[in-house]
Amino acid sequence: MTAILITGYRSFEIGIFDHKDPRVSIIKQAIRKDLIGYLENGVDWFIFTGNLGFEQWALEVANELKEEYPLQIATIFLFETHGDRWNEKNQEVLSQFRAVDFVKYYFPNYEQPTQFSQYYQFLLEKTEGAYVFYDTENETNLKYFLKKAKDMPHYQLLLLTFDRLNDMSQS
């Protein structure tokens, strides 16, 4: 079994507030290309954390690819209450994350800040690599996860960057 964690920018972090934004289709083209590459190289599990934005779009693509490839999808939420306060539209997205092959939460609820690093350490230990939409030009809290991932020997990281997206949009 080979599992890849998929994570990246949340939609508000990159200024995308509408699913019909033309940038979403370019991002999804890149996701499709990269996920097919993973599948053709033996990956059989895609792991999500349940965030809006990049993960949401990657989940949509992964679900489409299930018709062509034998893949499994898991969502491992940080907390059991993840998304409980989201609006109705986002609750629909949350239900898609909960309708995958395997769903768990790591902690029942928030108790202390160290839970975040424990959660990311768990995800790193349970996956062989990560597909991350992230660019050092636009830093977020993902930088802490990436630092841990880069420190792990043999952990495979594939970054989707703004430069790569620009190249795709021009071709």
Curated annotation (Swiss-Prot):
InterPro entries in the cross-refs: YspA
Stored Pfam families: YpsA
Superkingdom of this protein's organism: Bacteria
Gene3D superfamilies per record: 3.40.50.450
Similarity field: Belongs to the UPF0398 family.
Record's protein name: UPF0398 protein MGAS10750_Spy1462
Organism: Streptococcus pyogenes serotype M4 (strain MGAS10750)
